[in-house]
């Protein structure tokens, strides 16, 4: 599929206009952030302190594990929580994880799978969120958490977010005919096809405001 240069130009303007995120998520060393909005997280800092994740205003989804560490003689041992997937909504805020602490490995092993946690702002106010566990009964090493989050959202889990779905009509592929279904939700979920342009379309559309999305949809209709 070949995108009209005007579409790409419009999408580039969306990206430039929204390069500065409005929500800052602080991620401590004992939180393993695995996916953000179905994509590999891009963080700043974090060598000897919290990592910083920049997010857009509105609804976001994260996948993470809590991994507290404990001294055991000359060794350091870790305890792993289940993989948690959660969605939350926030605007113009800096958010921090509020997680339990455990006295020892025994207590961590007993309680970590049922732990209660929160995201709080700089005033200590908790952010409303919906959480679930992203479980995989198979081999845990090498899991593709962003792909698992995408499939989770497609299946409509309790912590699912919406998506932009682009489906290529293979029966009319020679005519480059594509059906585009625009969602009012915030992130891409499924792409059938191999075009890099479609991936860029997903990314830029997800960063656009509601007003820009409406204008973009109207522009697309006018091109037909």
UniProtKB/Swiss-Prot annotation:
UniProt keyword annotation of Signal present: yes
Keyword Signal listed: yes
Naturally occurring in which organism (per UniProt): Vibrio cholerae serotype O1 (strain ATCC 39315 / El Tor Inaba N16961)
A Pfam family annotated for this UniProt entry: DUF2057
Membership in a protein family: Belongs to the UPF0319 family.
Domain of life: Bacteria
Keywords: Signal
Protein name per its UniProtKB record: UPF0319 protein VC_1853
InterPro entries in alphabetical order: UPF0319 (IPR018635)
Signal peptide positions (record): 1-21
């Amino acid at each position: 599929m070949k995108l009209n240069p005007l579409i790409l130009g419009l999408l580039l303007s969306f990206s430039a206009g929204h390069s500065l995120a409005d929500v800052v998520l602080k991620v401590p060393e004992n939180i393993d952030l695995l996916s953000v909005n179905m994509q590999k997280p891009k963080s700043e800092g974090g060598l000897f302190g919290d990592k910083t994740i920049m997010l857009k205003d509105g609804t976001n989804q994260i996948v993470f594990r809590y991994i507290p560490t404990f001294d055991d003689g000359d060794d350091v041992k870790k305890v792993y929580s289940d993989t948690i997937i959660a969605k939350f909504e926030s605007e113009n805020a800096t958010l921090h994880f509020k997680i339990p602490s455990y006295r020892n490995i025994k207590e961590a092993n007993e309680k970590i799978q049922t732990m209660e946690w929160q995201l709080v702002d700089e005033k200590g106010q908790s952010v409303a969120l919906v959480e679930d566990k992203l479980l995989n009964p198979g081999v845990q090493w090498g899991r593709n958490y962003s792909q698992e989050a995408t499939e989770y959202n497609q299946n409509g889990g309790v912590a699912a977010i919406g998506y932009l779905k682009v489906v290529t009509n293979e029966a009319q592929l020679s005519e480059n005919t594509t059906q585009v279904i625009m969602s009012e939700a915030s992130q891409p979920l499924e792409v059938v096809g191999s075009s890099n342009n479609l991936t860029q379309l997903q990314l830029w559309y997800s960063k656009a405001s509601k007003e820009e999305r409406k204008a973009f949809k109207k522009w697309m209709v006018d091109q037909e």
